[in-house]
Design a protein with these regions (language model features):
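Helical element adjacent to the flavin cofactor pocket in flavoenzyme catalytic cores
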Residues: 174-226
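Extreme N-terminal leader/targeting segments of oxidoreductases
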Residues: 1-35, 50-58
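Glycine-rich FAD pyrophosphate-binding loop
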Residues: 52-74
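Glycine-rich Rossmann-fold phosphate-binding loop(s) that bind the pyrophosphate
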Residues: 40-45, 65
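Short gly/ser/thr-rich secondary-structure transition/capping motifs
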Residues: 15-23, 45, 216-221
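A short, glycine/Asx- and small/polar-enriched loop/turn
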Residues: 126, 156-170, 212-220
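Hydrophobic Val/Ile/Leu positions in short beta-strands of Rossmann-like dinucleotide-binding domains
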Residues: 37-38, 62
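Dinucleotide-binding Rossmann-like beta1-alpha1 core, especially the glycine-rich loop
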Residues: 77-159
């Protein structure tokens, strides 16, 4: 698999973008694999990628009944954040945030992550107390968090209704500046290309219709392609 670069972009632009190689193969299913992953969305593709990259498990098939990234991965909020209340959740999602921040470089594929920040608005004194607790949990775990007053919120988002007579008056907010969004289909494509580069078979239009068992152990799958 060739790496994407400014040079390759210029070269293919001059050639009318007709020389790009396929981002991943379209293989026929093999009779046997060490690992079979059902579902070619973000979770399935990422699992295949990290199995291959981190553990050297490459005899892997990802079976997708439709097209890669066409399920829940293509229908979600795309929000990336680690601003949770429970320490376990906060640390788990912060680990994910750090992976996101280097994901485009790791995959050599632009997942279009944009760290534009996230505001959680407080509409009462009680809600502000909860947001402060969450912010303190984040800070204690070394995660960026700021509690903003009304004027600070107004500077970030000037088009809200700041009237005290608004149905949900704004008291302040919890702000995580590193939060943001990513392009969901680019994430799926990046993981697909990365997994394929390690030899993982990505098999589309292959619905799993049943599991083959020996006792309580699953030893295979039945699919629409054999």
């Amino acid at each position: 698999m060739s790496r994407y670069s400014v040079l390759s972009l210029l070269k293919n632009a001059v050639g009318g973008h007709k020389g790009w190689e396929r981002a991943w193969r379209d293989p026929e299913p093999k009779p046997e694999y060490d690992v079979i992953i059902v579902g070619g969305g973000g979770h399935g593709l990422a699992t295949a990628y990290y199995l291959a990259k981190l553990y050297g498990v490459t005899n892997v098939a990802v079976l997708e009944k439709g097209y890669l990234g066409g399920g829940n991965t293509g229908r979600n909020t795309t929000i990336l954040r680690s601003n949770y209340l429970a320490s376990g959740n906060t640390l788990f999602y912060e680990k994910s945030m750090r992976l996101w921040e280097g994901l485009s470089q790791d995959l050599n594929f632009n997942v279009m992550m944009s760290q534009r920040g996230q505001l959680n608005l407080g509409h009462s004194d009680a809600q502000m107390t909860v947001l402060k607790r969450r912010g303190n949990t984040m800070r204690l775990n070394g995660i960026d968090a700021d509690i903003l007053d009304l004027e600070q919120v107004r500077k970030i988002a000037p088009y809200f209704d700041y009237s005290p007579n608004a149905r949900f008056p704004i008291y302040g907010a919890l702000w995580q500046g590193r939060a943001g969004i990513a392009r969901h289909d680019a994430v799926a494509w990046g993981y697909a290309r990365g997994a394929d580069g390690y030899g993982v078979d990505l098999i589309q239009n292959c619905e799993v219709t049943g599991f083959i068992k020996e006792g309580e152990k699953v030893v295979g799958v039945e699919t629409t392609r054999g």
